[in-house]
Amino acid sequence: MQVVVDNNQKLFNSKWPIVEAIMNQASTKKLALAISEAGGFPSLCAAPVGTASSIDFDPMYFELCDFIKANGSANVVVPLSVEWLSQKNFLKIVKDFKISHWEIFPRDTNTNTQRCLSEVLMDNLIYHGVKFLQRYSCVMGRLFNPVKNHPRLSILDAVTIKGSDGGGATGIGIHTVQETFNQQINYSKNVIPYGGIGSPHQVKNYLQQGAPAVGVGTLFAMCVESPLTHDVKLQMLNKSSTDIINIKGSTNGSLRQNAILLNSNIKTDGTDNKGNHTDDLTAGIHGNGTQGLIFAGHGIDYVTKIRTVRETIEYLTSEL
């Protein structure tokens, strides 16, 4: 598997081809540091606060500063949203920290992949200097469905693929991560499967098919170092993919999310949530196992105990 390791090191330069899929509220500094120390590649759910008309980038700035100081490098995947590109304070983050990997997220309710990889987005990246990241950073884009002939697809260093068996945002497609990967690998140089991954065989299989790395979310969320409370983790040990419900993120959009409900009273039709179930997620992560929800994918089927991050990465790479 030396070729696989070499391919991963060209894109991520980590010991193992295991990347932490960005998880809302769960991709914390503590988890990221543990993943980095264990030889995986970390992510950090660093984001500004406020609305599109009034964005405060200070929390994002200080969170990244804190992580980089503790980690000793800016080797981390951080989300990137279209509306930030015209903000001077965001460009300060770009220039000051030289983050190694940015992942472009679609931020509205339209999950159309053409929107995610639009010419407007790429023009803004270039105009505002983010193109400079190409010299020292990787720019990735999130896809829910295959894209074949988009004129700017070649600019991306990699695309991350999500499907019906992943956790959190899944779009409205019915294709699994593997099915979407099988199509996109014909059109893109680096395709990284996100979601539904929980076994050494899956990891080995994706790498042999040409993936430079695999994205892991649910298994890391169930690790000792994740922010989920111990009570919540114990409750999740009793769950499987049959407990996952595809819920609406909002009433006026197409965003769908795969989640395990810890409270049966949560409305799943999008009529009673703030910010795509953000409050429900907060209650789930920090609760006693009977509150809120947890975004989870089919990787939950492979969680049999609460492991450390190092034990999880050793398990996932045991067939390499």
Placement of each model-derived feature along the sequence:
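Residue-level detector of alpha-helix initiation sites
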Residues: A26, I197-G198
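Conserved donor-binding loops in enzymes that form glycosidic bonds
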Residues: I22, G195-G196
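Active-site entrance/lid segments in N-terminal catalytic domains of soluble metabolic enzymes
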Residues: M1-S188
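Conserved active-site-proximal phosphate/metal-binding subdomains
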Residues: L156, G166-I192, G198-L320
